[in-house]
Amino acid sequence: GLGIVALSSGIIVLYANSFVMKNRSRELGLYSVLGLEKRHLFSMILKETMIMGFVTLLLGIGVGALFDKLIYAFLQRLIGESTGLVSTFQVMTIPIVLVIFACIFGLLVLVNGFRLLRLNPLQLTKDGLKGEKKGRFLVIQTLLGLGTMGYGYYLALSVQNPVTAIMSFFLAVLLVILGTYLLFNAGTTVVLQLLKKKKSYYYKPNNMISISNLVFRMKKNAVGLATIAILSSMVLVTLVGAASIYAGKKDYLASAAPHDYSVTGTNVDVTSTRKVMDDFLSQSGNQVNRKTEVTYLYFGIKEQENNKLTIFSENERKVLPKSIFLVFSQATYKQLTGKDLNLTSNQVGLFTKNKTLKDQKSLSVNSQTYQIHDSLNDFIKGKVPNLFTIIVSDYSYLVVPDMDDFQESIKGTATTQSTYVGVNVKDPTHEAKKNSDLLDKLTDKETQQLAGQTTGLPKSYFTANSRYDAEGMVNGFVGGTFFIGIFLSIIFMLGTVLVIYYKQISEGYEDRERFVILQKIGLDDLQVKQTIGKQVLTVFFLPLIFAFIHLAFAYHMISLIVRIIGVLNPSLMLVVTIIVCGVFFLVYVLVFALTSRSYRRIVSM
């Protein structure tokens, strides 16, 4: 977080500095003509930067300390803790802030000093009026931009595993950023040149003026537009991810902790698991409202070829599985759903997230073929926890007629038996922490008493879970993640607004004299407004279109990444994405309207 904030601050400050120095070029040139040497100008800029840096740091640290308690109270509210105006301001962080901003303002001094050394007085006086040079190798840059962006999109769409998605995400982001800058730098110029060659379109007063203005300074426009597109994409991606995580925590809790208290026995029979739960209920004095006891198998898929599945062998080195299977007997299925499948020896029922298996009529598991008798719904949701949804995006529940026969058919494979006993109690909030700690102690004690399981990671063990612990963990993690997401979104949004504002003001001053000349040669006020409107629309909504396209291609990868954090409802994430896009569009249009008014006012002066 610190690195992202520091980098964002540096980019915003550098962009604002380029705007200010561009508009001061004539002033500095005049000082030089009047007799000031470059060392005098550099000394003046150095002192101005030091004063500006000191005032900025003083105000920033002061405002940060002032609102520290309020921000911390907001964070406490998000993570579900009792709110209070407690200060978290730490004096030891001030030197870190001072060093970061000293580096940023030191870089400003170097950039401005190099600019003074490079330009002579005459160049300084004309620098603000000078157009940008036309770039070289525009077609090659355009093709390279399309290639890098296309490959970034391919990475985002092709990844299927949540863990792999995290590793691929940053490479995809870098490729898309590079492609965006190349396309804005070269691709827009190529398109404008093609429009210039189209006489029926170009030789109209409004079109000619707008296109000529854009071509005249396209290099600078390209950097600004690409920066707006990237910052807007960052806002959208961060907000969609953070809001989806916060909105999806209830679904995750329902999946991770369907009961108030539960015990899971790994490679332990259900009688032993039930005994641990009974001991807990006896010692805690809780009265049971509902109880669920389930025995099932689970295993990872090593290879999949259409409907043919291969399970990892027992002594094989495990890697990340392509899919996870949970296997239940039809008796357990009837217990959970109240429905009887009436399966014969070679028939199975199947619920699957695996796209390849959804339309299959048969299924082969380690060369044993079964007919898929029924395609099932998610019958364990809210009844048995399935944390494997975090590891893989596709998982399956298999219902077999007889568990013993199925185990015999896959003998020698890496399968694990799990027994789950979960209870809902009459008053789940009564001494919830004390009860949760008691259940943890009981499961640890019973695990140690299992034969040969006293050291290391046991092959057979018990694990405890409670809704109280799950809620505390989820609220803390999700609330903190949401807070960071909102914080970063605000930073990116401020960066976007500032870049848009400086861009409009800068271009307004540059265009003013040109539009005065056009009015003098016969362009009326209506034509001036139409020309300005078309140019501003092009400049502003092109980055927004790119940002929405970036988000559309990143959506699949974002959904995989937030799955690890617990967002298990795709429909909910889609609704959140639409709302975020709608709100961002309204904010963007508002900024567009306000800055366009400033642009028109400057041009019309």
Predicted regions and their residues:
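Hydrophobic alpha-helical segments
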Residues: 51-195
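Basic-flanked hydrophobic alpha-helices used for secretion and membrane insertion
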Residues: 253, 259-264, 270-494
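N-terminal Sec/SRP start-transfer signal
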Residues: 135-139, 148, 183-232, 510
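Alpha-helical transmembrane segments and their immediate juxtamembrane interface regions
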Residues: 174-193, 250-276, 565-601
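Juxtamembrane inter-helical linkers in multi-pass membrane proteins
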Residues: 29, 119-131, 194-213, 508-527
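Short helix-loop junctions at transmembrane helix boundaries
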Residues: 61-93, 150-167, 542-605
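Hydrophobic alpha-helical transmembrane segments of multi-pass inner-membrane transport and secretion
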Residues: 1-29, 49-63, 143, 177, ...
